[in-house]
Amino acid sequence: MRTLTIYHLGLIDYRTAWDVQRRIARARSAGQVGDTLLLLEHPPTITLGSRASTEHLLVPAEHLSAEGVTVVQSDRGGGATYHAPGQIVAYPIFKLLQHGRDIGRYLRGLEESVIRVLRDDGLIGERVPGLTGVWVRNGAAKICAIGIKVSAGGVTTHGLALNVNIDLRGFDLIVPCGVHGRGVTSMSAELGEVVAMSSVAERLIGHLCAVFDLEPAVVVTAGQWTAHLPAAERDHLAQR
C-alpha cells in the first residue's frame, strides 16, 4: 500500500498555496515525493475556475477588495467558489495513473470521501447528476465544492472545499459554481451546532485513504512543511 504525506498548513493565502501545490506536483511528477495531501483554510477569497467569469461575481470587484475579499483566476476546473475560515480545503497531489483511475473516477472518489465524512455525523451527502460536488437535502444545497486540474504528466492539483463552520454569507457574493437555483450550506448549519474542524479533518484523511487505498504516513505541521520539500523547491520558497 502506498503512503500519503499530509501537510497541515493552517490558514494560508490562496496564491501561496497554489504555488506550493505546483512545486509539490513537479516533484511528484519527477518521482521525488509520493502522494501528498494539503489540508488548510484560506482567508476570504473568491476563485474563478476555467468555466467561471466575472459575470459570476454579484458585486463589483472594487467592493470585494474594500471588504477584504481577494479574487483569483485559477487554473482549476469548475466555476466560481468562495473560501474563508471555517471551510476545510483539501488539495490531493496524486499520481493519477498509479491509482488506476481516470478523471471521472477520481472526482467520484473525492465525492465519496466527503459523503462518508458527512455520514459519520448523520448527514446524507448526495451527488447530483451532471454536476460535480456533494449536496444535501435532495440536491437543494451544496456543502462541498470540487474543482481540480490534472497535469500532462497525470498529477492532480486543487481539490475540494468542505463547508464546516464557514460564514455562508460570503456565497451571496457569487453564483456558486455557476449553478443557479440551488443553495449553499455547511455542516454546522445542517446540524445546528459548531463542528470540530480537527475531527472533520482527521476523518476526511481516513476516508480519502480508504477510497484511494493509501496509508497515512508523515504528518507535517505548518511550521515544518518546507523541510519536507525537495531541495530545489525548498530553496525557491525560502527566497520568496
From Swiss-Prot:
The keyword Translocase does not apply. The record marks K142 as: Lowers pKa of active site Cys. Its EC number is 2.3.1.181. PROSITE patterns: BPL_LPL_CATALYTIC (PS51733), LIPB (PS01313). One of its GO terms (biological process) is protein modification process. Substrate binds at R76, G77, G78, G79, A80, T81, Y82, H83, A145, I146, G147, G159, L160, A161. It comes from the Bacteria. It catalyses: octanoyl-[ACP] + L-lysyl-[protein] = N(6)-octanoyl-L-lysyl-[protein] + holo-[ACP] + H(+). It is found in: Cytoplasm. Residues 31-216 form the BPL/LPL catalytic domain. One of its GO terms (cellular component) is cytoplasm. InterPro entries: aa-tRNA-synth_II/BPL/LPL, BPL_LPL_catalytic, Octanoyltransferase, Octanoyltransferase_CS. Pathway: Protein modification; protein lipoylation via endogenous pathway; protein N(6)-(lipoyl)lysine from octanoyl-[acyl-carrier-protein]: step 1/2. Belongs to the LipB family. NCBIfam families: lipB, PRK14345.1. HAMAP family: LipB. Catalyzes the transfer of endogenously produced octanoic acid from octanoyl-acyl-carrier-protein onto the lipoyl domains of lipoate-dependent enzymes. Lipoyl-ACP can also act as a substrate although octanoyl-ACP is likely to be the physiological substrate. In the reaction, the free carboxyl group of octanoic acid is attached via an amide linkage to the epsilon-amino group of a specific lysine residue of lipoyl domains of lipoate-dependent enzymes. This is Octanoyltransferase. It comes from Roseiflexus sp. (strain RS-1). The gene is lipB.
